[in-house]
UniProtKB/Swiss-Prot annotation:
InterPro entries: KH_dom, KH_dom-like_a/b, KH_dom_type_2, KH_sf_prok-type, Ribosomal_S3_C_sf, Ribosomal_uS3_bac-typ, Ribosomal_uS3_C, Ribosomal_uS3_CS. The gene is rpsC. It comes from Thermosynechococcus vestitus (strain NIES-2133 / IAM M-273 / BP-1). This is Small ribosomal subunit protein uS3. The lineage of its organism: Bacteria, Bacillati, Cyanobacteriota, Cyanophyceae, Acaryochloridales. The keyword Phosphoprotein does not apply. Part of the 30S ribosomal subunit. Forms a tight complex with proteins S10 and S14.
Length: 238
C-alpha cells in the first residue's frame, strides 16, 4: 500500500523554504525547536481570527525575528501598532529574558490560494454544521477564482453525523504530487463537531517553478462559470 510523503517537506530546498532558519549546537537544538513550536502555537491561538497563513522564524544570536503572513494584517498590527506591541510583550513573558523579539507582518496576496486558509475556512463551516460537500464545493470555487492550477480536498470522520466514519475526497484540475518542481501548498486542520473530530486536508497546485524562478507564475484569476460541473467525491474508506 502506497504512503504519501508530506508535500512541503518533500520539496524543501527545491520549491519550498524552511519555516525555521537558524543554526544551533546539538545541546541547544531541542530547546530552540520546542521554543519555535510554542511560538507558532501561541500566535495561532492569540490571532485565531486574523487568518494566519504561515509563521516563519529566523534567529541571530539571541534575536528572534518573526515573519507573520496573514490575510488580515490590520487585526495583527492593531490601532497604532498596539497589536504588535502587545504580541511582543506576551512573547517576552513566554521566552527567556535574554531574547530580543522582532515581528514583521506580511499580507497574503491571494488569500484563496493558500491551503492553510482554505482548510481553516472548511473547518469553520463544518463546525457550524454546514454539510461537508457544500463546504468543500464552496472552498474549491473560491480557490479556482483565485487562479490556481488544481486543488484536492479530503475530509475524514463521521461525515454529516454518520454512525460509521469514512474518508471522502475530491479533486479539480491537476495536483502532481510526484513532480518536484510543482509548487504544492498543503495544510491539515481538524474540525471539532458535536459528532467528533473531522480531519481536513487540502492540497493546492499553484503551477510549476521553472529554472531561474523562485515561485510559480500565477495564472489569471478565473470568474465563476455558471455551467461548471459539481465536484465528484470518492469514498476512500475501504
Amino acid at each position: 500500500m502506497g504512503q504519501k510523503i508530506h508535500p512541503i517537506g518533500f520539496r524543501l530546498g527545491i520549491t519550498q523554504d524552511h519555516r525555521s532558519r537558524w543554526y544551533a549546537d546539538s545541546d541547544r537544538y531541542p530547546e530552540l525547536l520546542q521554543e519555535d513550536h510554542r511560538i507558532r502555537t501561541f500566535i495561532n491561538q492569540q490571532l485565531a481570527n486574523a487568518g494566519i497563513a504561515e509563521v516563519r522564524i529566523e534567529r541571530k544570536a539571541d534575536q528572534v525575528e518573526l515573519q507573520i503572513r496573514t490575510a488580515r494584517p490590520g487585526v495583527v498590527v492593531g490601532k497604532g501598532g498596539q497589536g504588535i506591541e502587545e504580541l511582543r510583550k506576551q512573547l517576552r513573558q513566554m521566552l527567556p529574558a535574554n531574547r530580543t523579539i522582532k515581528v514583521n507582518v506580511v499580507e497574503v496576496n491571494r488569500v484563496d490560494a493558500e491551503a492553510s486558509l482554505l482548510a481553516e475556512y472548511i473547518t469553520q463551516q463544518l463546525e457550524r454544521r454546514v454539510a461537508f460537500r457544500r463546504a468543500v464545493r464552496q472552498a474549491i470555487q473560491r480557490a479556482q477564482r483565485a487562479g490556481i492550477e488544481g486543488i484536492k480536498v479530503q475530509v475524514a470522520g463521521r461525515l454529516n453525523g454518520a454512525e460509521i466514519a469514512r474518508t471522502e475526497w475530491t479533486r479539480e484540475g491537476r495536483v502532481p504530487l510526484h513532480t518536484l518542481r510543482a509548487d504544492i501548498d498543503y495544510a491539515y486542520r481538524t474540525a471539532r463537531t458535536i459528532y467528533g473530530i473531522l480531519g481536513v486536508k487540502v492540497w493546492i497546485f499553484k503551477g510549476e517553478v521553472l529554472p531561474g524562478q523562485t515561485e510559480a507564475v500565477p495564472r489569471e484569476a478565473t470568474r465563476r462559470s455558471p455551467q461548471r460541473r459539481l465536484p465528484q467525491f470518492e469514498n476512500r474508506s475501504n
